Amino acid sequence: MAPTQAQKVLEAFEDFLKCLDLESYQEKYRPIKTVEQDLPRELNPLPDLYDHYWKPNGNTLHFPDFETFFDQWWEKRLRPLNEFIRKYFWGCSYEFVRLGLEARLYRTAVSIWTQFHFCYRWNASCQLRLTATWELDAQGIDAQIQAEDRLIGIQIKKETYRSEAREGNRFLRRREHSALLEVPYTLQSPEELERKAQRARTREEAYRLWVKIAHHLERLPNGFVIFRESYVKDLENFLKQNATTLSGLIPWDKVAREALTGP
């Protein structure tokens, strides 16, 4: 896809992100954690999220709001939803279960939207080919990048994330990717992290790394955090220079130290 078209898709997706009323969503969904069971395959929202929000070819620049997305997801799955409700929520109202699933899928959607912004930003700014599919995502790989003759897996890693490394190692053994790169991001501002670093007694180095990461991120007016062009450019340069020697899991702190430039 031509860079100009990739830029248009990126801008359209950022316009969608800017319109999200995050404050209202958080107020509505944050206290609701009533549907925490593993969802059966028939209720997996990943295919729908990719269908509605991942449009790398730019065939359409329309992204539905969350309510429209959820309504369509719900209507397509009435039969498996009935089975799920009978199994786990016998005697509960549909309204109770629906609200719980709304909250569950909203949290999933925010994470996926963050992944997609990274991918759209990459396509608009970088030369190395990026691929993302819901099938890969279901296995713990948010995207994969072709660098030389190496296929590098990507995991977008929020600051508070903890368990992805073990999942990533299993994926590497199973799929034989050359390496798995953790791409860290934080919801905190550089100023907040700098204050924590100054007060820290045992974790100052980690906070300094997150300060460095935060300088490559941008907060939209509604609070949604997105990736700056400098972030993906630094990662691409790192992969071009090191792809042939990378193997196994490349953890977030190594990426922050060696791939990202300082503020």
Swiss-Prot record:
Keywords: Endonuclease, Hydrolase, Nuclease, Restriction system
EC class of the enzyme, as a word: hydrolase
Keyword Cytoplasm among UniProt keywords: no
Molecular function (Gene Ontology), one example: DNA binding
Catalysed transformations (reactions): Endonucleolytic cleavage of DNA to give specific double-stranded fragments with terminal 5'-phosphates
Protein name (Swiss-Prot/TrEMBL): Type II restriction enzyme TthHB8I
Coiled coil stretches, renumbered: none
EC number: 3.1.21.4
Superkingdom classification of source: Bacteria
GO annotation terms (biological process): DNA restriction-modification system
Matching InterPro entries: Restrct_endonuc_II_TaqI
